[in-house]
Amino acid sequence: MILRLKDQTLIKINSTRSYLSSLVFRRDSHSQARTKPDHDRRRRGYERDVRIEEKKEHDGLFLCKSKGQHLLTNTRILDSIVRSSDIRPTDTVLEIGPGTGNLTMKLLEAAQNVVAVELDKRMVEILRKRVSDHGFADKLTIIQKDVLKTDFPHFDLVVANIPYNISSPLVAKLVYGSNTFRSATLLLQKEFSRRLLANPGDSDFNRLAVNVKLVADVKFVMDVSKREFVPPPKVDSSVIRITPKEIIPDVNVQEWLAFTRTCFGKKNKTLGSMFRQKKKVMELQSLSAGRHGSNVEVMNQTGGDSDSDVEEDGKDDLLCLDTDASMFKERVIEILRTNGFEEKRPSKLSHRELLHLLSLFNQAGIFFHDITSLQMDLHE
């Protein structure tokens, strides 16, 4: 009987210890949970719009993911972006999409002036008040317009957290625009950054990369986790630095862009296969004839950067063309064959090779740009 009572007492003691331990463990777990960044807790249960509170600046601001409104909140990363930008005390910095001013405040401390382009009126009001409260109002110029439709004033550098949904056209505007600048340090979607960094032979080498790198060098700076943003996007980001080249190739930009659109429309096909297709032959014949005053109807151009279509070698298309078109096609293929390009693929070619091929075509009277079009298409 005494032994049984001792056993029962031990069981109760062990049970009590286990219960107390569980309480301590749960308390520690809750304590650890409270040390996690605020955005880790806020991210749960939100779909599109997220309400955030920044204690000193504003209360109850709704951010829309569909408009690319993701605020970078990590001070360490903000400092790293500013350091990697090599800002001089005399510089004017262009910031695109400043939001509530987390990066703007850092830029104002380092540069002489900051020009911030922001479309959202709410953000403009918050930014203006925040900057004024910190005594930087005379160093900041705010342009409340759509950045893609705005003529930029003079600037020396670009430092910006770019909205994901305008990355391609904005990079195009910067590198092929009329403004001269030293560099652009951009926070972009990680996948988009990888595409910009891609080189010939890489699986993701694409038309955007080949066009940007014609006139600028692109350098990787660092990766940034999606957890560092409020609200957190679905994907991670990267910081890259774009530096315009001092010397660029002597090539007609519109002709080059049209040429790369043709080549990278089916970038993994051989050039011989691509230029044997009846539709492509007729299109090039029309565009080339238009340079000589011909009234030949210009066919609609096809674009894209996809290899999803079924590959056609086009060997029998020659029988379907009239005499002039057949002669034109033979001229195109002869240029490719004679210069060793017939079996090569655009995704493997360097800038030097692409420029050489375009020069050979133009010298033979074969052109790619529709002279009636004024649109500059840099990206897919």
From Swiss-Prot:
Family the entry assigns: Belongs to the class I-like SAM-binding methyltransferase superfamily. rRNA adenine N(6)-methyltransferase family.
Gene3D superfamilies assigned: 1.10.8.480, Vaccinia Virus protein VP39
Protein name per Swiss-Prot or TrEMBL: Ribosomal RNA small subunit methyltransferase, mitochondrial
Observed phenotype of the null mutant: No visible phenotype when grown under normal conditions or under cold stress, but lack of methylation of the adenosine dinucleotide present in the mitochondrial 18S rRNA.
Gene Ontology CC annotations of this record: mitochondrion
Interval spanned by the transit peptide: 1-26
Species this chain originates from: Arabidopsis thaliana (Mouse-ear cress)
NCBIfam families per UniProt: ksgA (TIGR00755)
Molecular-function annotations in GO: RNA binding; rRNA (adenine-N6,N6-)-dimethyltransferase activity
Keywords in alphabetical order: Methyltransferase, Mitochondrion, RNA-binding, rRNA processing, S-adenosyl-L-methionine, Transferase, Transit peptide
Name of the coding gene: DIM1B
A UniProt-annotated Pfam family: RrnaAD
Biological classification of the source: Eukaryota, Viridiplantae, Streptophyta, Embryophyta, Tracheophyta
Protein role: N6-adenine methyltransferase which modifies the AA dinucleotide at the plant mitochondrial 18S rRNA nucleotides A1914 and A1915. Not active as mitochondrial transcription factor.
Main subcellular location: mitochondrion
Protein's GO biological process: adenosine metabolic process
